[in-house]
Amino acid sequence: MPKAVAVILVNWNTPAFTANCIRSLIEYCDNLLFDIIVVDNGSTDGSLSTLSTEFPELIYIDNQENLGFAEGNNKGLQHSIDAGYEYSLVINTDTLVDEDIVSGLMTHLNNYPKAAAVQPAIFWMHNRTKLWNGPCGFNALLGITYSKTQDNIQELISYQNVEWVTGCCILIRNSTLKTAGLFNKQFFLYYEDVELSYRLRSHGYEVHYLPTSKMYHEAGISGKSSTKSAEGFLNPFIHYYTSRNHIWFLRKYGKPVFYPLNWIYNAGYYLAVLAYLKLRGRNKKVSLLLKGIKEGLFTPQTLIWPNN
């Protein structure tokens, strides 16, 4: 019989961060509860060799190419389901824990059978008293997603039934994935967690935020550079994926009665971003943002996800 939880880490050229995350999980969490699956997304820096040398006991999946966050995690999730694990913990590699979040999150799902998934409170790595991600929601009027990070949110002591949970760290009940499907690989990167949350909820499940479990996040390590280029620190492709996937999400899950205001508000937002990028000379970002908007509006959504 497998252990209860498969912990899934998707690595892409970040072996040092991944190793630190693994060490913290091994140190603080009950090792009898989980196995760790490292999915390497076509790293070019020898990540797989580095990690497997230090942690030979882990399970490794070599994707050979960068399949994106969504499909990279799907490879680990499919292995978890096929191997008979009850739960899967999807967790970013640039995170650390200093408590047993595996048992905390698992106990919560055991106590709430209607919940398909649960996330902990996530704090900034560099400021461990400041919340990076709290209860997540969707403003249907404006057509934007959000996460509550105000100081008073930290005072929550009971779980919240929320609209979506972040892919930074989610414990998911595998049986619900068999019903609703895995991440939508068409999204590749960004909004795949929001879309899956809404799909799980459309099947009658709940998704929860558990403030009594916590972890720490570096945030966006694979999407930013340590040195500033003509395009700044942020990878230009982030503008492409976030704009395209945001619009796809609105087309699928937005409320038609609010569409006029959604499009007016977001058109204004994207025009402001385009103007800012143009003034800063970030021409590649301008081009990719326009491409993302165009594809979001006009590319058919195939809504591909594996079903078991």
Language-model-detected regions and their locations in the chain:
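A conserved acidic beta->alpha catalytic loop
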Residues: 24, 40-49, 65
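Short, flexible, basic/aromatic active-site loop/helix in glycosyltransferases
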Residues: 138-163
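Non-catalytic, C-terminal membrane-associated alpha-helical segments of glycosyltransferases
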Residues: 255-308
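Short beta-strand-to-loop acidic/aromatic patch adjacent to the donor-nucleotide binding site
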Residues: 85-96
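A short, conserved alpha-helix in the catalytic core of glycosyltransferases
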Residues: 163-172, 176-182, 186-216
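Conserved donor NDP-sugar-binding/catalytic core segment of glycosyltransferases
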Residues: 96-132, 138
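Short, acidic, metal-binding catalytic loop of nucleotide-sugar glycosyltransferases
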Residues: 23-33
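Glycine-rich, basic loop-to-helix element that forms the pyrophosphate-binding segment
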Residues: 62-83
